[in-house]
Amino acid sequence: MLFLAVFCGFLAEYQLEHVIENQREKQFMRSMVEDLEKDIAGLETESKLVKTQYDKLDSLTEMIYEGDLSQFQVTKMYELQRRYLYPLTLKLINRTELQLTNSGGMRLIRNKQVADSIIYYWGITELLYDTKNNINVHRDRAKDISFIIFNNKYYKHTEGFSLGFSLDPSKGEPALMTRNPAVLSEFANRISHMSDLLKRNYKQGRVDHQARNAKRLIQLIKKEYHLE
């Protein structure tokens, strides 16, 4: 009888732990879905911004390659390089990933298909960051050359952050610091390469692909864990 009582107590404790683990697992999956929904919003916004960015950078390179730099084109070049030659800063949500790491890792997710899909998603996120960082290196090199071509004195200097980057009329019509064909061509070549990377490697190959991954993963989690 004593053995039976001990066994029943052990069984009840085991069942309680099992229920608690199930609840924790399901809570992690709810948290993961919330993260993914935020990721989708961020990725879709990034996709639109990046398309505008590489379209405008393509316009800038076309002006340089055409070679007929009128005052109108020079003014437009000042606007485009300042407004669209910016670094990529996308950061996806890693809240649930950190929580799982601090709680014992993926062993808490006992559904193998879901666990494998989450690990795959996180792996693609790291590849996305690698691509982003690589493009930012090319951007930095192009930006270094821009300091030889464009004179910042023609821009309005305002306190705090501004998306306007307006030209200052009091400084007169903006002029290029150099019209050296080799310098301008290198600048255009670097921007053209950056634009191609933005279009194919980053937007199509990473951002749009990861948005689709996030949507599929949400569907899988909701199906396997019976979430609304």
Q: What is the predicted role of each segment?
A:
Residues 11-228:
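Long, hydrophobic alpha-helical segments that serve as membrane-spanning/inserting helices
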Residues 1-11:
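Hydrophobic membrane-insertion alpha-helices, especially the h-region
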